């Protein structure tokens, strides 16, 4: 399978998998932006993508940014549908206690390509019973 990438900014870096077998590809900022504590901003990557048929791209945080600085992707995982052709933008939020500077060329998120299913939705009067039933939200312990 191929992921087609179009640069919309000369500073853009094409996403890649750092190691063989990695699920995610790093996404990079094309701009310098400062995020104050509890502030969120849209960060530009300078790329558009064309996904393979029957796939989606999930945008996820980078664990190092989250652990060391409290920087995460606000709507994680963000979903890019197969038919979307606009620039990929990443909504970052600073959950840390100090300002954080996003540098040009910095790895800001990761993109994972996943298969999608097209389902036929059917309304029913009642669902089948299970042993779990409606128990959720910590019902098996905290």
From Swiss-Prot:
GO terms for molecular function: dUTP diphosphatase activity; magnesium ion binding. Substrate binds at residues 62-64, 75, 79-81. PANTHER family: DEOXYURIDINE 5'-TRIPHOSPHATE NUCLEOTIDOHYDROLASE (PTHR11241:SF0). Disulfide bonds: none annotated. It catalyses: dUTP + H2O = dUMP + diphosphate + H(+). Pathway: Pyrimidine metabolism; dUMP biosynthesis; dUMP from dCTP (dUTP route): step 2/2. GO terms for biological process: dUMP biosynthetic process; dUTP catabolic process. This is Deoxyuridine 5'-triphosphate nucleotidohydrolase. NCBIfam families: dut, PRK00601.1.
